[in-house]
């Protein structure tokens, strides 16, 4: 693990509303940071991106409601930041074959997925929607002086029952396409994250801890960004929409 622009095995420091189920409401708001963005903010920079392409994926967790309540999660939204100084995709499908959402308690299972096509932001699953957050007003992500677009992924129609007040894990990632002229290497998926106190926006449930999973979704412990390539803790940005049931 480390902060290395060229390592294949590294953790990289790395809005529009879709249609939701009737009665669905925002219950977790840990959205994109609104303050202290990019290198212009110096040591107070809040935004970062992370990936873990050693042999699995990076995730995080959240809780919905209060203990004793029952909820059904309708939709989960996250963001990704692909590209670097050498290659910047026009579409998310240029870099990735698919996108997947894993969800669960200790270990995670896939609950939604969609195929992607080069030259397009359309997906093979109407319940998975991709949009460019930077077109909707999000600030471009500064990666070592290269400005990168931020892509929003909405997984809808999930129908996931959860217990109120209990933390559940999630992970979003995509299978990378082969990198031209880089034999055996594929594009790594980068999750948008931020430091909660510096974000200037609601960061529900942020605890400065992310989660590691192998490719099958089995838990491999926790990850703290501080001291592992960054100078402060971070959480993956996520928004959750759900409805309460009796």
Where are these regions (language model features)?
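Bacterial N-terminal signal peptides that target proteins for export
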Residues: 1-10
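Hydrophobic h-region of N-terminal signal peptides that target proteins for export
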Residues: 13-22
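Boundary/junction segments of secreted and surface-exposed precursor proteins
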Residues: 21-51, 245-246
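Short beta-strands within extracellular/lumenal beta-sheet-rich domains
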Residues: 52-67, 151-155
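Extended extracellular/luminal ectodomain segments enriched in beta-structured repeat modules
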Residues: 66-77, 163-167
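A short beta-strand element within beta-rich, extracytoplasmic domains
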Residues: 71-90
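Aromatic- and Gly/Pro-enriched, solvent-exposed loop/edge beta-strand patches characteristic
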Residues: 90-203
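PGST-rich, cysteine-poor low-complexity/disordered linker and tail segments that act as flexible spacers
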Residues: 191-246
